Design a protein with these regions (language model features):
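Glycine-rich FAD pyrophosphate-binding loop
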Residues: 1-15
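Short, glycine-/Ser/Thr-/acidic-enriched flexible segments
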Residues: 6-7, 19, 26-27, 182, ...
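Short, solvent-exposed loop/turn and secondary-structure capping segments
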Residues: 10-14, 25, 138, 218, ...
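N-terminal glycine-rich dinucleotide-binding loop that anchors FAD/FMN and/or NAD(P) in oxidoreductases
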Residues: 14-49, 81-88
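An anion/pyrophosphate-binding glycine-rich loop and adjacent beta-alpha core
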Residues: 46-50, 253-255, 259-358
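Conserved redox-cofactor binding core of oxidoreductases
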Residues: 58, 62-70, 80-203, 209, ...
Length: 358
């Protein structure tokens, strides 16, 4: 495994750590929250003509599941509903959008089905490799469409990197840090290795028997590349901040294109609606689930449904004065904040007060 930075982790180490996977037997033990029933009713009444033919059978299965749930649960005993079909349809609808040129994109059915059919198995696989998940609650990351998040016990993505890094080493794998991949080696149409360069300038050439996996995290920290391909956002400013690792600059995409690979959906980058407006850092302030916060603009007005997808939240935020909004929290909500500590919250409060009073 090649890693161009001094340590492995990439964007995973910067995430909230949640894995979205439908596990109804676990989720059904938790009560439904306000608004979830209404979301299901909206899906039940969604225009079938808006659904791609490949997804129709799953959509009709989901409608039957929702009808059964609504008929067999009362307000007193409503539980958190979920199914693989709900995950699949929400993945499809959540990823369906048009760009400024009226070009529509949506998830390839076979790929979405593979994801939603197998992601729970991946959670179990991660558990088998030593990742400990908090089973005391079902998480819902900002911009997710449903409560189905499996969250590791340790903050952010640390458990994945620690345990999977150890797994590679204990199974005779090798990790080369500060080693930048520069070119895929091809024989005919087959990729058989990779050329790389270490931080000291030394060249590295690795030959493989089973190809090369490009797991390089995209290009979210490369503003010029985002601007080059963008067809979705009205504007991506030169000075826009990012929650991404500075390593996420599109290296893998360039490697693939050089080797003749096709690209798809490059104009549709995702923006993260909540981050530090000065630094782009993700985990400052109080980050909690959408059921526990309200977004307000500088005028103190709520301006969006907090349960919406990240693109909807981001577009709504950019329409506010200076692109700034606030997450309203009280002491009870503070206790639910993720990926932070009491000391860190107090330090941020002190810094905020100092910045506004000096």
């Amino acid at each position: 495994m090649l890693e161009k930075f001094v340590a492995i982790g990439g964007n995973t180490i910067r995430t909230g750590g949640q894995v979205n996977a439908a596990e109804p037997k676990w989720q059904n033990a938790f009560p439904a929250l306000a608004g979830e029933k209404e979301t299901l009713i909206q899906l039940l009444n969604h225009d079938e003509n808006d659904i791609d033919e490949a997804y129709i059978e799953d959509f009709n299965t989901l409608k039957r599941q929702i009808k059964d749930y609504l008929e067999n649960s009362s307000n007193e005993d409503e539980y958190l509903f979920d199914s693989v079909e709900l995950h699949r349809i929400q993945t499809y609808l959540g990823g369906k959008r048009k760009d400024r040129n009226n070009v529509e994109i949506s998830g390839d059915y076979d790929l979405v089905k593979t994801l939603t059919d197998n992601v729970l198995e991946s959670v179990y696989w991660l558990k088998d490799k030593g990742v400990h998940f908090d089973r005391s609650f079902v998480d819902m990351p900002v911009g997710a469409l449903w409560r189905r998040g499996h969250k590791p016990m340790k903050a952010q993505g640390l458990e994945y990197i620690e345990n999977l890094g150890d797994y590679v080493k204990h199974n005779h794998g090798r990790i080369f840090t500060e080693t930048t991949a520069e070119k895929l080696i091809k024989e005919g149409n087959q990729v058989v290795g990779i050329e790389a360069r270490k931080a000291n300038g030394a060249k590295v050439k690795i030959h493989t028997r089973h190809g090369v996996v490009l797991a390089t995290g995209g290009f979210g920290a490369n503003t010029k590349m985002l601007q080059q391909y963008n067809t979705y956002w009205d504007n991506i400013p030169d000075d826009i901040k990012t929650t991404n690792s500075p390593a996420i600059t599109g290296d893998g995409i360039r490697l693939g294109v050089q080797a003749g690979a096709d690209i798809v959906g490059m104009g549709f980058s995702q923006m993260m609606p909540i981050s530090d407006p000065k630094t782009g850092a993700l985990f400052t302030g109080l980050i909690v689930t959408p059921s526990n916060f309200v977004f307000v603009n500088k005028e103190g007005q709520r301006f969006v449904n907090e349960f919406e997808s990240r693109d909807v939240l981001s577009k709504a935020a950019l329409e506010q004065k200076d692109g700034i909004f606030y997450i309203i929290a009280d002491a009870n909500i503070k206790a639910l904040a993720m990926n932070t500590t009491e000391d860190k919250i107090n330090q941020e409060l002190e810094a905020s007060f100092s910045a506004t009073t000096c």
